Design a protein with these regions (language model features):
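Extended, alpha-helix-rich binding/interface surfaces that flank or overlap catalytic cores
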Residues: 40
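Structured surface interface patches that mediate subunit assembly and partner/cofactor docking
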Residues: 2-6, 10-13, 20-33, 50-196
């Protein structure tokens, strides 16, 4: 199967956001309940490698669920590591064979083409999470928004345990990114509370 989309725009956006995170922002809250910027960056370190392995199929039969809670350590080289892993993930999904058959990530087996969309969703939505938590604005390619809207349009309003919270109602005429965020259980108006 030929690649259905390219990860470069989403990867480039996430790298720019990660590059702009400052050390004093690591303890800031994020839209992910109970997760700080540090926690979310540690999650991104893990997911970028997991989805690269899903593309190469090296994870098949040996992937495991991500650690529960927010106990994953953040490596000292998180900034350069995330950038490097996003580059290799992008390259891995450019290989036509990556899109064939089934694959695994995080202990979940899916058709490879569906796994690619899950990876795109994770990269795109967590880029927004990190951006809004650190006072930035993410850039999302219109083509990526269209892919993710189609993927998520049948989301259960009650959410998907372990993945998405209950859908947040967003006006039909809201920007496409806001409508996508609502489907993932996020409030597009979320902002960190002002320091006391």
């Amino acid at each position: 199967m030929e690649p259905q989309f390219d990860f470069e725009p989403a990867a480039r956006s996430l790298v720019a956001i990660v590059d702009a995170v400052t050390e004093d922002q690591l303890t800031h809250p994020t839209p992910c309940a109970g997760s700080t910027v540090r926690d979310l960056l540690a999650h991104v370190v893990g997911l970028t490698e997991a989805f690269r392995q899903a593309a190469t199929k090296e994870s098949v039969g040996r992937s495991t669920p991500p650690p529960a809670g927010n106990d994953s350590p953040l490596p000292d080289d998180w900034r350069t590591r995330i950038a490097a892993q996003l580059e290799t993930l992008t390259s891995a999904w450019r290989v036509p064979e990556a899109w064939d058959g089934d694959t695994e990530a995080g202990g979940v087996e899916l058709p490879a083409a569906v796994m690619a969309i899950v990876a795109l969703d994770e990269i795109t939505v967590h880029a927004w999470d990190l951006a809004v938590a650190t006072g930035q604005r993410p850039t999302v390619a219109p083509a990526d928004l269209a892919i993710l809207h189609e993927f998520l349009c049948e989301t259960d309003p009650a959410g998907t345990p372990g993945l998405f919270g209950p859908i947040v109602e967003v006006p039909a005429d809201a920007p496409a990114l806001d409508r996508l965020l609502g489907l993932t259980g996020r409030d597009p108006a979320w902002r960190p509370a002002a320091p006391a």
